[in-house]
């Protein structure tokens, strides 16, 4: 989240990014910069390139805007304001000095306001800010570190201003350098960087000395709080004093030579913290030992109580067992006595019943025999009645069946007689029809023979005349012509059969 917010704030100026990080509402004020500051310095401060932070420069593969300014200078040939050449270093030192002073003053004001606000917010001991960097409250606070590197020549000019500034800060931080101090907002001037710069300036000429301002802003955005793990006394004891010292050094105000009063306060504060940590550890150790002793005593007492309870429980169990055995014995004895009494009573009752039975055995046998005879008679009578009823039903069925069979036989006889009559009638009709047909044929033959003797000479047919001058393409014969031809052929055959004279142009008309 910190990298994402840093990418979002690249296009803003340094003042705007600081206001956003510290959570101060930006008012519509004009930045108090000196008139001698050049446009190149403003562009350098407002440039979107990320300045170096305590984590180092951003990787060159993430974005082209995040590249090192030296690489941009070598690749594109464009010079940046805070990395000028040796020729322009002497001319722009005064302007840069004023702008840097204004910038540091503004940061000091912001620092004082934030310290006052934290003092008001953390007045009660319950709302103390955790010192550890991985604490959940520190995640939501911004972490600001500013490294100011100056050459030895410029240290003499700024010595007075820096001492006054450190004095003010020490006076303000006396009341605020408590356990509730916000360790995330710190200013530090690296001694190693100053010594390296002094060594370099001895080798380089005065004209090539240049002052660089590196404002590194690292934002710790609010992250999701991790699930708290149960901390035991063993885990707390494993944390060494070196880790505590490193954390305290990171949370120190200034580590430079010029801030001797703050170093003394810081050392006192560190000693106080170490003493508190030792006392806390001793208290924790004593509490742990006391807790272990109490736990041991509690376990011993619980073991003794358990043994006593086991003994009491065994005694009670034995008593219960003895009581149960006695009760079972009594119960079994009572059951045996009751069973003996029941057997005796049953034997007495049996003897009484046997005597009564021996007296009335004969009577009972007679009665039983009579009853059996009656039952047999009744059964025989019922069987005879059933047989009679079955015979009567069978006879009635037989009669009906015979009647039906007789009726069917009579019907068959009648049908056969009727068929015979019909056949005889058909035969007589056929014989009569044959006789009539034969007589008719004889008559017809006699008529034909008689007619064949009288050959009639007919007039020749009139030639055909068309109804108009138009002649049809195809001549269609009429049905009368075919009929006349058939008649003529039949007449010829009759004539030949009767051995008559051959007809020349005559045609015989058949009789109908």
Swiss-Prot record:
Coiled coil regions, renumbered to chain: 267-429
Bias kind Low complexity: ranges: 30-39, 78-95
Ranges annotated as biased composition (Basic and acidic residues): 178-200, 260-302, 310-386
Any single GO CC term annotated in Swiss-Prot or TrEMBL for this entry: axoneme
Keywords of this entry: Cell projection, Cilium, Coiled coil, Cytoplasm, Cytoskeleton
Tissue spec. comment: Expressed in amphid and phasmid ciliated neurons.
Intrachain S-S bonds: none
Location of this chain's protein in the cell: Cell projection, Cilium; Cytoplasm, Cytoskeleton, Cilium axoneme
GO molecular function: microtubule binding
UniProt keyword Transmembrane helix present: no
Main location: other
Region (Disordered): 24-103, 168-386, 481-512
GO biological process, one term: mitotic cytokinesis
Compositionally biased intervals (Polar residues): 230-239, 502-512
PANTHER family linked to this entry: MICROTUBULE-ASSOCIATED PROTEIN 9
Protein known as: Protein maph-9
Record organism: Caenorhabditis elegans
